[in-house]
Amino acid sequence: MSQISTEIGKQIRTFRKKRKMTLEALAAVICKSKSTVSKYENGEIPVDIETLYEIASALQIHVEQLLYCPPRHANLPD
């Protein structure tokens, strides 16, 4: 999957663990299967925007916190 999906998935996992929430608990709150949430976290499938907002709400964070990806350093010519 894309680098963006992978990074968003990492953010979901990080915040879920900070909240001491299990995959099962997050899945139940957002009405998705445990398998689907696991795939989101592993970047195997993209998260649609509506689900991203539901996840952010379940984790009690701003959706922007899930969208943060470290900047990539481009090799620009001198």
PLM feature segments, named:
Residues 12, 26-27, 37-40, 66:
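Conserved hydrophobic/aromatic packing and binding residues within compact polymer-binding modules
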Residues 6, 17-18, 46:
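Short amphipathic helical patch at the helix-1/turn junction of helix-turn-helix
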Residues 2, 67-78:
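Short, charged recognition helix plus adjacent turn
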